[in-house]
Every structure is written in structure tokens, then in C-alpha cells.
Amino acid sequence: MTTPVRRRGRTLRQRLLGYITDAVDRLRKAWSILTLAQTRLLNALAGIRPGFSSGTGAKLRAAIAAFNTSLAAFARTVGAWAERWAATDLPLIYREGAWTLLDNADRRQATFTWTQRHQTAITALSAQYYVDLTARIQEALRRARAFLRAAQDASRDAGRGRFDIAELREQHPLDTVVYANQARHPVDAWARAAVTWQAVTTANTAAARTSMDELGISYVEIRDGADCGWRDHRDPDRADRTLRTVQDALAHPVAHAHCQRELLPRMDLIGRTNIMSGAEL
């Protein structure tokens, strides 16, 4: 029906990879403060016999104090990461999404400016994602404190010969995050999925708004994984190499974590209104 757009330069995913990799690396390093603190406390407990004695009490207090110090350091570091990601990185990613679309439309990057509509869009996205991330951080802190309470409770059990270090780690795995379905996932896997979702959503929102506001485009061409659905990965309405209205693209900038979706401008369809959103190329 129409001729597909030929990309000019790097794909959106290639342009975002540096932001995603850097953010995941920084988040991983911040989280390592927490996991190392847990390991140090468990190692300290391994050399302490549960029960009440002056020697045991002093060693336990020192180990707990060290854990609390590390917990505070984790909270500061990961909180600073979330602030930088929301306040600095996401606006840069938004601009990158706009620039990528303009490059593919063979328009100057200076066509994009921080209009009120763009500012409103990035402010809403940044605020939403900051809340999401800080909620995850608060949950990690809650779980860390639960682990500490469990260790303290075990220390009072004089009937124990030794702390069951393996049991404490198994019941309180601080190197994981817990999803809504109660499934535990490694921090690294969660971090990459969350950061990628937020980055691609932000960039594609910018691309869609730039299409509409700066170029007056009604339709964008979708490039995505061959098996990816439009609303979610299993949606039988396939996304790749279809035409979508800009409004539909704003409603579904991504379909799932690690989504490869990219919006390409259809300058040749400006003024057309008779194409059904979802039409195949």
C-alpha cells in the first residue's frame, strides 16, 4: 500500500543503549551496597553463638551498627540515582526520541524545542517513574529491616547452637525484588527491564508528540519485533510494519519490557485521514 520509511543513521534502540547501560550499571552498584551489607552481617553472625553474654552482645551490636550504616548509605545512593534518572536522564532521552524522529524525517534537530506541551509530557513521565522507582526502593529498605529483625530474633534464641545463615539468606534474599505476583527476580534483571521500559516509553512519547506538534504528521510507521503485539506482547494485532495514528502511538508507546518499538515518520501521508490505524504496509 505504501513505501516503508528508510531509517537514517542509528536506530532508536542504538541511541538509547548508552543511557540504559549506564543507568543499569549505576543502579547495580548502588544495590551492591545492600547485598554486601547482608553478606557481612551474615558472616559476622556465623562467628557468634546465639544467646545472652557480654561477648556475644558486643559483637552483635557492632554487626548491627555496621549493617544500619550500610543501609543508610544504600538509601542515599539509590535515592540519588533515582533523582538523577528522573530529573536529568529522562529529559535527555525524551529529546533523543524527538531528534531520532526528526533525523528519520530528514529535518533539522533544531526543529524540536522545549515547548509547553513537551515540558508537560516529560514532567508527567518523570514524576510517574520517580514514584515507581522510589516505591521499589522503599520496599527494598522494608525487606532489609525485616531481615535485620529476623537476625536479631535469632540471636536471642539461646537454644540454637549456631545461626542458620543459609536459612536467613533464603528467607530474606536482598539481591532480589518481589513483583506483584510475589515472584522474586534478580535485581539486575528487574533493573534492566524497568530502565528499558521507562527509556523506550519516554523516547517514543517524544517521537509521537514531535510528529504531531512539529511536523503535523497523522500517521507513524511502527518497527518492532516480528512477533510483538500492539498492546502487549501476546496481542494478535501485530505491531511491526504497520501504520498507526499518532494518538494510538501515544497510547501504546511500548508493549512490554525490553520492547524494541520505534516510530518512523510518514511525511508522505500528511493530510490523509482514510487509513485505518493498524493497516499493514
Give, region by region, the residue ranges found by the protein language model.
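Acidic, glycine-rich two-metal-ion catalytic cores of nucleic acid-processing enzymes
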Residues: 178, 182-278
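N-terminal leader/targeting and assembly helices and adjacent pre-domain segments
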Residues: 1-178, 274-281
